């Protein structure tokens, strides 16, 4: 398969990538996501929580019995909701690309997921050093990380069981955005990374990409067309909204998705959102992401958000959620400017009313998740 046709009317893949750093969501929270998302057009879930050791740090090891039973149950629940469960492997740290053994290890682990019904797998090389670590890899791949990653996927593709005709593979390359923060964190990337990767990667493999930045304010059709022209493979956007991990953990991204070109489905195969660490609160911004993914041309951020709040909490709660959202946005602006939060008397009154609303619902799951921000509101 080649790149998605620019005449495509909608994203083929729509859903969530649980790909953040921090405590993974519970199985119960994931099931609630499936029910919530399936009703809003979600059809894909990529399992890739950075802090699941068997996904990343200990990826070569099988899941222990209890953990596997829970995962198998989750896979079955996804299938009941007609959601494609995508299992992500993160083998990047210390991987010896020139060795055959890691490919066989990955395929052996994938076979268990295949037996449970998984038909899409992702290999994730995000957030690892930008240069090959081992001399044998540097000799074999000409010191090119891009060539090594493409060749590794080609080896997986070639060695998978012949019966896996319905299996799809995705790749998240180490260079997943032109954001300069990537090079500062992991080292400068080789020139022509995407072109080199494209030449080595099987055409059937789709590629994940976050956009012009790791956490982009805007993603335009022009940007994704330019990336697609270099990569020449189907693109799946890994959109880091509304995620709030790492340096963003004090932020509460509950507003609507914004700044996404309504024409992106013309050039993008899939669109996945990385969610909040707080799963119950996270359903609010995700509702707007699902609205965009299902009908990008008709999407109106504020109308979608108001409808999501009303559906979840009732129309009378809308002013309180507007106040909570406004407070968090004001707090972020103040932190960025390194100054105290500045609020008008009217804004303080609205925040106090919102605080009383939160107090009335303090025993609900979402209210427990918002407790740190409620404390900040009281102190404002």
Predicted features along the sequence, with ranges:
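Feature activates predominantly on carbohydrate-active enzymes
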Residues: 1-111, 115-119, 126
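Catalytic-core regions of glycoside hydrolase
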Residues: 19, 119, 135-295
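Active-site-proximal loop/turn and secondary-structure-junction residues that shape catalytic pockets
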Residues: 22, 33, 51-53, 89-93, ...
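Residue-level preference for long, well-ordered alpha-helices that form the structural scaffold
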Residues: 26, 63, 67, 98-102, ...
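A generic secondary-structure signal
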Residues: 36, 77, 108-112, 155-159, ...
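A generic structural motif
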Residues: 47-50, 238-241, 299-309
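C-terminal functional modules
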Residues: 294-380
């Amino acid at each position: 398969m080649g790149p998605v046709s620019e005449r495509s009317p909608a994203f083929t893949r729509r859903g969530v990538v649980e790909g953040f750093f921090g405590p993974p969501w519970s199985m119960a929270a994931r099931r609630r996501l499936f029910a919530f998302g399936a009703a809003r057009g979600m059809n894909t879930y990529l399992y890739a929580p950075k802090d699941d050791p068997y996904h990343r740090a200990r990826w070569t090891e099988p899941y222990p019995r209890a953990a596997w039973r829970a995962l198998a149950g989750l896979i079955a629940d996804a299938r009941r909701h007609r959601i494609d469960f995508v299992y992500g492997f993160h083998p990047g740290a210390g991987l010896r690309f020139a060795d055959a053994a890691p490919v066989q290890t990955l395929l052996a682990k994938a076979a268990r997921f295949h037996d449970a019904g998984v038909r899409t797998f992702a290999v994730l090389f995000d957030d690892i050093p930008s240069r090959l670590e081992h001399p044998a890899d540097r000799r074999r791949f000409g010191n090119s990380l891009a060539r090594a990653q493409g060749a590794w996927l080609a080896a997986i593709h070639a060695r998978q069981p012949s019966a896996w005709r319905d299996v799809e593979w995705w790749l998240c390359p180490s260079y997943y955005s032109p954001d300069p923060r990537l090079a500062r964190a992991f080292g400068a990337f080789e020139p022509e990374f995407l072109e080199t990767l494209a030449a080595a990667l099987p055409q059937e493999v789709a590629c994940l990409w976050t956009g012009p930045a790791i956490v982009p304010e805007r993603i335009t059709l022009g940007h994704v067309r330019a990336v697609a022209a270099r990569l020449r493979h189907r693109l799946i956007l890994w959109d880091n909204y509304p995620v709030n991990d790492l340096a963003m953990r004090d932020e509460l991204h509950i507003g609507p998705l914004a700044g996404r070109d309504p024409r992106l489905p013309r050039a993008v195969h899939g669109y996945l959102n990385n969610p909040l660490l707080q799963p119950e609160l996270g359903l609010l911004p995700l509702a707007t992401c699902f609205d965009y993914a299902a009908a990008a041309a008709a999407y109106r951020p504020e109308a979608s958000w108001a409808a999501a709040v009303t559906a979840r909490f009732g129309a009378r709660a809308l002013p309180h959620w507007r106040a909570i959202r406004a407070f968090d946005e004001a707090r972020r602006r103040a932190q960025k400017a390194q100054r105290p939060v500045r609020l008008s008397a009217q804004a303080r009154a609205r925040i106090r009313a919102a605080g009383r609303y939160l107090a009335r619902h303090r025993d609900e799951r979402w209210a427990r998740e918002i407790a740190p921000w409620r404390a900040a509101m009281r102190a404002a």
